[in-house]
């Protein structure tokens, strides 16, 4: 059973966000998601400057088992991507909530954050799977 950090917000599609000091949000996939996918072999990220829309696919995580679309938890402009994943996609497996982050978004509508789940709500999603 993986631990779900209480300081993050979650999408039911297994992405997490963390607010940063500059007002942007870091996006990644949860420990649970990486466990389901297995060993990562490739991560396709959006481009810096791209606009992402909440609920729409914007990245792909490929593992030895499957390729899975990654959905934007909130809308906004991509301001950074985790270039380390290009050479080391396994960071998603070893540190899903840390060094395995995918990209950062400057939100266009911060109220979308309110629609995301807290740790308890996300645990309920996992329990219902």
From Swiss-Prot:
GO terms for cellular component: cytosol; glycine cleavage complex. Its cofactor is (R)-lipoate. Residues 24-106 form the Lipoyl-binding domain. PROSITE patterns: BIOTINYL_LIPOYL, LIPOYL. PANTHER family: GLYCINE CLEAVAGE SYSTEM H PROTEIN, GLYCINE CLEAVAGE SYSTEM H PROTEIN-RELATED. NCBIfam families: gcvH, PRK01202.1. Belongs to the GcvH family. This is Glycine cleavage system H protein.
């Amino acid at each position: 059973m993986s631990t779900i950090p209480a300081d993050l917000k979650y999408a039911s599609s297994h992405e997490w966000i963390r607010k940063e000091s500059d007002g942007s949000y870091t996006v990644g996939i949860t420990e649970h998601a990486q466990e389901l996918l297995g060993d990562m072999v490739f991560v396709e990220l959006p481009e810096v400057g791209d606009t992402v829309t909440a609920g729409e696919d914007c990245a792909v995580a490929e593992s030895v088992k499957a390729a899975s679309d990654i959905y934007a938890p909130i809308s906004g402009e991509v301001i950074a991507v985790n270039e380390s994943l290009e050479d080391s996609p396994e960071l998603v497996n070893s540190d899903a909530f840390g060094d395995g982050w995918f990209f950062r978004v400057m939100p266009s509508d911060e109220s979308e954050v309110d629609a995301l789940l807290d740790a308890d709500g996300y645990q309920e999603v996992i329990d219902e799977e």
